[in-house]
């Protein structure tokens, strides 16, 4: 039935992502896929409908808008425009999104095949083009770590993604730069701001609306801990590849005021601070790296 899920633990649809939200705009969604053609009445009751013309591997979802909702089309169009190419960054089975509104705007978003740079690090490019707008081109450095239940069942991965900009006059070289905003991502952005200079993604348990997460849920705490360990691995990789510079350091959770004791992402602050103190991760003036506990900061005049 509609209420029964056969998806595995790591599936993006396990918690019904997106489906319940369609009832904001429709009372009778239709699904046409494979040999199935049905509508859903009263939220849970499937009813067979006439088969549509479509390719064998094509799925169609039809959402007849509520006739009394005069603002639905404008709201949906605004939602499409907010989507942006970044929506594809953490989706491993979707690499293209196209949308169009009759008599209105349109957009196309594409994700490149990831370029492997190490065992758990990739460079990913996403691009987007919307009607009347300049093309958007984003490059990301994405690190991942598989996560498991206490029974050792893999349930996806935690990821951290750093925004990349090309280094001027150095073809093929990239630098890490802080992002303007960093909402926690559970496949798609939530309303939870991380205060980080990079993006964090993982299979967090969310509220039914999927825009928030229970901060004291043990599973969510576990994922934050795994992300903290992954962040230190990323710092080491950036150092070894001569990318851990001042710009990259500005991405890290180093401001105690933003990560007070007991706050959700405080473990990332603690892990990065400990790593900087104990390991050679701080750039030296004369090249190379040194542990913060063994370094001195010169006055700005000398710098």
Please tell me what each predicted stretch does.
Residues 26-303:
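GHKL/Bergerat-fold ATPase module
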